[in-house]
Amino acid sequence: MSFSIKNNQINGSDSVYFIGEVGINHNGDLELAKKIILEAKKAGFSAVKFQKRNPELSTPESMKSKLRETPWGEMTYLEYKYKIEFGKKEYDEISKYCKELEIDWFASCWDLDSLDFLLNYEPPVLKIASAKITDKVLLESHASSGLPIIMSTGMSTMDEIDKAYEILKNNPLAILHTTSTYPCPPEELNLNMIETLSEIYPENPI
């Protein structure tokens, strides 16, 4: 199965949709985020991807009050999460800037609140982080959007991948073999998994 993200054909063979991972590497600094976006555009990327969270919802209770050292000094983990999280003001500017540069942008959403937030910007595609592949309610909400979806597999088992696939299969869906080790030693890349996923899900770009 092939599908389009705007004018980009996604078919797993003769086309490439280059995604620059911004994630939270902007450290809550809008100007730094814009610099990363500009460099991605210069390098020929098709899109940039962020991570969107509601820190109150996505931070485990046991972690919220834990202290940690940060570039801004010692603070609780929850305070740190809020420090690096962009809100409407920042994403309004990011959306405007990406439109000016003619580069797509979207985000992996880690909770329902963040998904609702992102959908206001009419993203061309949604991204499922491998850490959320077992969140049935979140997957169902992504599926109900009707948008194309990119799903990372990370450290997921084949059973977990298949259960997620059953929820998302009616959407245009690309499945990524990804690693959760950064940086990843070459011997742990297990690139044969790309072929395995292609055999199991022949109708989907891998």
Predicted regions and their residues:
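Catalytic cores and adjacent flexible loops of soluble metabolic enzymes
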Residues: 1-206
